[in-house]
């Protein structure tokens, strides 16, 4: 037990914030707003969607990497990861191993396809590969996902701080929501990227301060580790192959790959950031630079959890009724160990809300891109002017920002209904990853297969998720002690809990219990676990005990299996007719050292070499010829050629021929004689999507 006589478990009272703490919180908001104003003024003459949604498409990889990190390392992560260590074991650290494969897969399998197409919305790919309907279904699913996620990210830290410190709940919700909406709407993607960079710095500063001061309060990090070791919290590995094991090495590494690649590989927010880089190489560099940051936030959170357990090892604040849920432990810990250090709790508040700001701003900008590209332009105003499109994007971002704020208010009233709604959110990312995987990896998949795979996977995952919430299988926790709680102050301590009203307490439990289902693999509520209902084990019970970390992998497998079966039953796409720009050469990427005679059959007939002449000079791909323009040229050129003769000579000055001349690895069907280029076009057209 930490030395001192003014800690919450001894006095029954929780320390409160000072004026300086509120000033530091306000400072974070002001700096974020100023960055938005700066870029609004600086780029006032660049009123186009490329600048607003893609930051002009020439961003440096450093701010992009920081924004990639900040977008989904949210306040829920700051609250949830330490709570995981406090309640369970250190096995969770294995999720960091999966990050290596996540970044590799995202940077070298998925992102090159999106970058090659120069998309603004990731779901444009689904229309090109399948159909407009699949694109719309994917885009709307993503928007619902992000709206729910943004609301929880905004509400969770506000509620946790309010419950522990009395920090004004709706004051923080409204101020953070409005400032975030303001600078995102005003400054666009550049403002989002640079505010994310500032906010990730605040997150690291806050986490480091909490760890240093927390370790000091228990006699150092080694002493904290020893205390945790006494109760088995320092177990480093669980090699159980049982998929019901909540956190095994297999689940955290293999399941974690699918959970996180759904974020870094195909999520609109991350794809948009990657496409804002000046080149594919810069986008890949940004991805890899982001990796140490992922590890830093993860392991800082893990170590804070160990010190937090060491501090409360003889008096669990939840059972002592100081707080009502695990997501309130970190703010309580901050107030206990740093409440007397003037202004430092405010640094933690800045850290917490920086995570919220970065996530919400990224979400608003990505939703604006999807609504503009996938709904408004796709169905209503295809030929909208750039100025008007930019203004519409700003309006959409602002409108959804207000919706996000409003949804947090509704969240405080819905209670159990909200729990069911938010549980659905966690099962969406896997099916979306599945439909992109189906399109990029399996050339035989067709539109019917994409529809069936996406819908079937969503239904199956909803079934598992809802069943899990009903059954609530018990999950054992590491031991917690109450031997040194000051029970004479039980009444006083209980009165502290009254800082949270009834509805807030209910939603706090909802937030915690829903955290497991989110993409950043955050954590389950202690309250939900302890209240697990006793039910009769039916034949499907094992399905409902599936570890949440396997959800994305299960969803991807379901999507691909259903999608391929339906595709073959309804007339598969011929691999030889597949446009290679829409595919990812998986085996070439994973096994580049294999000889050509082995790799050739593993390409399943897709002619990836056909695209090389468009990629040999990246300047052409990025700036001079958009892929849709290439397709349009094919359609026009082939119509004219086929009406006359396949031996008609192609114009040596045409843009396609100029691109062909840049290919240093000439394919057999392309010769240096322009007279034979028509046949090249005939053959090349067969590799487009029919």
Which functions belong to the PLM regions below?
Residues 1-690:
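Membrane-embedded helix-loop-helix hairpins and adjacent transmembrane boundary segments
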């Amino acid at each position: 037990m930490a030395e001192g006589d003014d800690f919450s478990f001894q006095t029954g009272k929780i320390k409160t914030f000072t004026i300086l703490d509120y000033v530091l919180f306000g400072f974070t908001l002001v700096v974020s707003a100023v960055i938005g104003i700066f870029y609004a003024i600086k780029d006032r003459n660049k009123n186009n969607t490329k600048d607003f949604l893609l930051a002009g498409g020439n961003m440096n990889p450093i701010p992009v990497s920081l924004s990639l990190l900040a977008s989904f390392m949210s306040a829920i992560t700051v609250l949830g990861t330490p709570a995981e260590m406090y309640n369970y074991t250190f096995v969770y650290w294995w999720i960091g191993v999966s990050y290596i494969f996540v970044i590799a897969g995202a940077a070298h399998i998925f992102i090159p396809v999106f970058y090659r197409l120069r998309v603004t919305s990731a779901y444009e790919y689904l229309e090109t590969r399948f159909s407009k309907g699949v694109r719309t279904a994917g885009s709307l699913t993503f928007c619902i996902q992000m709206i729910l996620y943004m609301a929880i990210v905004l509400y969770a830290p506000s509620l946790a701080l309010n419950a522990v410190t009395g920090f004004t709940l709706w004051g923080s919700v409204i101020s953070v929501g409005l400032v975030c909406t303001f600078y995102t709407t005003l400054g666009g993607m550049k403002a989002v990227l640079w505010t994310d960079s500032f906010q990730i710095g605040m997150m690291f500063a806050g986490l480091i301060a909490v760890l240093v001061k927390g370790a000091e309060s228990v006699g150092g990090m080694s002493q904290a580790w020893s205390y945790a070791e006494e109760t088995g919290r320092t177990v480093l590995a669980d090699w159980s192959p049982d998929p019901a094991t909540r956190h095994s090495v297999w689940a955290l590494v293999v399941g974690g790959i699918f959970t996180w690649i759904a974020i870094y590989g195909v999520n609109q927010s991350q794809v948009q950031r990657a496409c804002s880089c000046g080149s594919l190489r810069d986008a890949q560099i940004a991805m890899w630079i982001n990796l140490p940051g992922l590890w830093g936030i993860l392991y800082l959170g893990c170590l804070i959890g160990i010190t937090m357990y060491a501090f409360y090892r003889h008096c669990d604040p939840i059972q002592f009724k100081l707080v009502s849920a695990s997501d309130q432990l970190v703010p309580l810990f901050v107030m206990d160990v740093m409440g007397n250090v003037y202004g430092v709790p405010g640094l933690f508040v800045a850290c917490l809300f920086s995570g919220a700001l970065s996530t919400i701003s990224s979400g608003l900008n990505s939703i604006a891109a999807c609504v503009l590209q996938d709904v408004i332009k796709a169905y209503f105003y295809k030929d909208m002017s750039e100025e008007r499109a930019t203004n519409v994007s700003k309006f959409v971002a602002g409108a959804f920002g207000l919706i996000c704020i409003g949804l947090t208010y509704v969240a405080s009233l819905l209670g159990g209904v909200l729990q069911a709604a938010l549980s659905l959110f966690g099962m969406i990312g896997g099916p979306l990853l599945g439909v992109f995987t189906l399109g990029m990896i399996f050339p035989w998949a067709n539109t019917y297969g994409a529809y069936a795979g996406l819908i079937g996977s969503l239904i199956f995952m909803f079934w598992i998720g809802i069943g899990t919430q009903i059954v609530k299988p018990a999950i054992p926790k590491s031991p917690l002690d109450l031997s040194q709680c000051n029970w004479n102050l039980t009444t006083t301590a209980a009165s502290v809990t009254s800082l949270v009203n009834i509805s807030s307490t209910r939603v706090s439990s909802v937030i915690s219990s829903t955290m497991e289902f989110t993409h950043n693999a955050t954590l389950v509520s202690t309250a939900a676990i302890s209240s697990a209902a006793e039910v009769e084990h039916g034949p499907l019970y094992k399905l409902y005990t599936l570890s949440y970390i396997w959800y994305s992998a299960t969803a991807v497998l379901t999507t691909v299996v259903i999608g391929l079966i339906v595709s073959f039953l309804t007339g598969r796409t011929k691999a030889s007719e597949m446009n290679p720009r829409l595919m990812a050469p998986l085996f070439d990427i994973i096994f580049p050292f294999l000889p050509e005679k082995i790799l050739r059959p593993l390409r399943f007939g897709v002619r990836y070499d056909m695209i090389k002449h468009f990629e040999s000079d990246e300047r052409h791909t990025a700036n001079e010829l958009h892929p849709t323009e290439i397709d349009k040229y094919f359609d026009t050129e082939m119509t004219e050629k086929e009406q006359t003769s396949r031996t008609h000579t192609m114009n040596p000055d045409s843009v396609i021929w100029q691109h062909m001349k840049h290919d240093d690895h000439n394919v057999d069907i392309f010769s240096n004689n322009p007279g034979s280029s028509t046949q090249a076009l005939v053959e090349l057209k067969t590799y487009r999507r029919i």
